[in-house]
């Protein structure tokens, strides 16, 4: 980690929201992008599209996402959240579920937040590129071993996923 100049932060095990809150307070940013560790196949072009949409929108929304509703495969989730919105909401969050799943509060209370969703042209919401189980891990491992898989377009990746 030091060799590659990557910052590592560890915080509360049970209160992920608090972990993010402390990290945000240590860094000066207007937005942060949330990508979960169980998503090793994340697509950089999805991140870039969300950034492009936010810029075109002049950063008027509080959350830019591709999961509300989900149209991309599970495991390709990207959420860009306004830090002020995130920090102000902390006092309102009572349920431990929302403290562990840090954006669930915003989606449950979507009517109070400005959310913009980036939709896939094709609905791939039934595809799972996420690693939540040993079976998921083994499937992703098989996918990664396929020559050139990581450089393929999403449609090709989905077709390969369906074939194994």
Model-assigned labels for residue ranges:
Residues 42-127, 135-138, 142, 156-164:
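Conserved core of the sugar-phosphate nucleotidyltransferase
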Residues 2-55:
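Short phosphate-binding loop-to-helix
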Residues 96, 146-152:
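Cytochrome P450 catalytic domain signature, combining two hallmark sequence patches
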């Amino acid at each position: 980690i030091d060799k590659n100049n990557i910052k590592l932060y560890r915080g509360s095990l049970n209160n992920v929201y608090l972990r993010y809150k402390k990290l945000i307070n240590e860094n000066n940013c207007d937005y942060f992008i949330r990508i979960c560790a169980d998503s090793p196949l994340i697509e950089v072009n999805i991140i870039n599209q969300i950034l492009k949409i936010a810029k075109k929108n002049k950063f008027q929304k509080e959350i830019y996402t591709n999961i509300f509703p989900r149209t991309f495969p599970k495991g390709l989730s990207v959420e860009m959240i306004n830090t002020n919105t995130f920090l102000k909401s902390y006092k309102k969050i009572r349920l431990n579920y929302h403290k562990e799943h840090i954006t669930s509060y915003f989606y449950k209370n979507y009517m109070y937040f400005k959310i913009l969703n980036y939709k896939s042209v094709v609905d791939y919401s039934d595809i799972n590129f996420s690693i939540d189980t040993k079976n998921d891990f083994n499937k992703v491992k098989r996918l990664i071993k396929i020559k050139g898989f990581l450089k393929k377009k999403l449609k090709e990746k989905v077709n390969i996923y369906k074939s194994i």
